[in-house]
Amino acid sequence: MAARLCCQLDPARDVLCLRPVGAESCGRPLSWSPGALPPPSPPSVPADDRAHLSLRGLPACAFSSAGPCALRFTSARRMETTVNAPQSLPTPLHKRTLGLSPRSTTWIEEYIKDCVFKDWEESGEELRLKVFVLGGCRHKLVCSPAPCNFFTSA
């Protein structure tokens, strides 16, 4: 089962924070105040790191003892482009594998992975739904502005 994480922008520190979503949510809306501790969940990161994960472009699995996974990324706007007009997508200028060898990724995966880091590093969090998924990665993220409403199923 994929780990579920809620991603919130903390404007006070200008960072993205990932918080584990408890298995009891089962796709129902979930919200908590930005300073609250996350509900308990099976640790994918060391226990002392789970209470406060402040990230700039790093997936949750960056803290895993197994090393980071790669994440595929798209926003609602890019999903339309990716699904409906794949021939219009540019070749990525550079690829970020984060644990995957170049031979194990397709050009579309490289393009999508590159999008998330550009958005996080250059423009910050958009106020729209973002979905992060990659086959083989045990992390699945749903991002929305605070309060975090987790409404999809893994």
Swiss-Prot record:
Spell out the post-translational modification annotation for this entry: A fraction may be phosphorylated in insect cells and HepG2 cells, a human hepatoblastoma cell line. Phosphorylated in vitro by host protein kinase C or mitogen-activated protein kinase. N-acetylated in insect cells.
Does the keyword Membrane belong to this entry? no
* GO (cellular component) term, any one: host cell mitochondrion
InterPro entries attached to this UniProt entry: Transactivation_prot_X
Q: What is the superkingdom listed in this entry's lineage?
A: Viruses
Q: Cite the entry's keywords alphabetically.
A: Activation of host NF-kappa-B by virus, Activator, Apoptosis, Host cytoplasm, Host G2/M cell cycle arrest by virus, Host mitochondrion, Host nucleus, Host-virus interaction, Modulation of host cell cycle by virus, Transcription, Transcription regulation
**Which region ranges are annotated with the description Mitochondrial targeting sequence?**
68-117
Kindly list the places in or outside the cell where this protein is found, as annotated in its UniProt entry.
Host cytoplasm; Host nucleus; Host mitochondrion
Does Nucleus count among this protein's keywords?
no
Biological processes, Gene Ontology terms: DNA-templated transcription; symbiont-mediated activation of host NF-kappaB cascade; symbiont-mediated arrest of host cell cycle during G2/M transition; viral genome replication
- Tell me, what does this protein do in biology? Multifunctional protein that plays a role in silencing host antiviral defenses and promoting viral transcription. Does not seem to be essential for HBV infection. May be directly involved in development of cirrhosis and liver cancer (hepatocellular carcinoma). Most of cytosolic activities involve modulation of cytosolic calcium. The effect on apoptosis is controversial depending on the cell types in which the studies have been conducted. May induce apoptosis by localizing in mitochondria and causing loss of mitochondrial membrane potential.
Query: What interactions and quaternary structure are annotated?
Result: May form homodimer. May interact with host CEBPA, CFLAR, CREB1, DDB1, E4F1, HBXIP, HSPD1/HSP60, NFKBIA, POLR2E and SMAD4. Interacts with host SMC5-SMC6 complex and induces its degradation. Interacts with host TRPC4AP; leading to prevent ubiquitination of TRPC4AP. Interacts with host PLSCR1; this interaction promotes ubiquitination and degradation of HBx and impairs HBx-mediated cell proliferation.
Q: Which family does it belong to?
A: Belongs to the orthohepadnavirus protein X family.
The record, for HAMAP family, names:
HBV_X (MF_04074)
What is this protein's name?
Protein X
Specify the species: Hepatitis B virus genotype H subtype adw4 (isolate Nicaragua/1853Nic/1997) (HBV-H)
